Amino acid sequence: MRIVLVGPPGAGKGTQATRLAETLHIPHISTGDLFRANISQQTELGKLAKSYMDAGNLVPDEVTIAMDRTAWSSPTPRAFLLDGFPRNVSQAEALDELLETEDMKLDAVLDLEAPEDEVVKRIAGRRVCRNDSAHVFHVTYTPPKKEGVCDVCGGELYQRDDDSEETVRKRLEVYHTQTEPIIDYYKSQGLVATIAATGP
């Protein structure tokens, strides 16, 4: 099964992708995780991506595609769940071309929908462990036992630069103008299923 997961920032794509990948026993390829790993390792691609992410802008196609290609094993996996890619029609077309060279097609595009105010609340309240970015808390929904301290490893919790309310609103604006059009692109292929992503 080959699935693309789309939705605004804060809709729960990462959480749902992890659950789906485990249930379906397919690899989960997260562009956001690739970006953060490259930023943490201070690679040239990571530094470039960070400058765009901190401003709330989409990372340019050539940078995104370069990072995503590093995540694909050789040969291309026959089944996968993509989270965070494609983010615009140009990337969707590039993905279709790549899959076509491997004699594959997407099976489904899952569109997670969430109200904008809920998205802002979710993201602005998120806190991440400096020691392990997989340890994520929320000041309202899943607060740590001790403020600012990771329950799992005792590491410091912090708010990512791209999680401030101002940056979140900018990211939503970018999502509406650049990413939402891929939903129509995939609807024309009969691939889209819309899922309400409400609640914490």
Swiss-Prot record:
| Name under which the protein is recorded | Adenylate kinase
What are the protein's UniProt keywords? ATP-binding, Cytoplasm, Kinase, Nucleotide biosynthesis, Nucleotide-binding, Transferase
Q: Which domain of life is it from?
A: Bacteria
Question: What positions belong to coiled-coil segments?
Answer: none
Mind telling me which GO cellular component terms the entry cites?
cytoplasm
Molecular function (Gene Ontology), one example: ATP binding
Q: Which reaction does this enzyme catalyse, per its entry?
A: AMP + ATP = 2 ADP
Which pathway does this chain act in?
Answer: Purine metabolism; AMP biosynthesis via salvage pathway; AMP from ADP: step 1/1
Tell me its family. Answer: Belongs to the adenylate kinase family.
Q: How does it assemble?
A: Monomer.
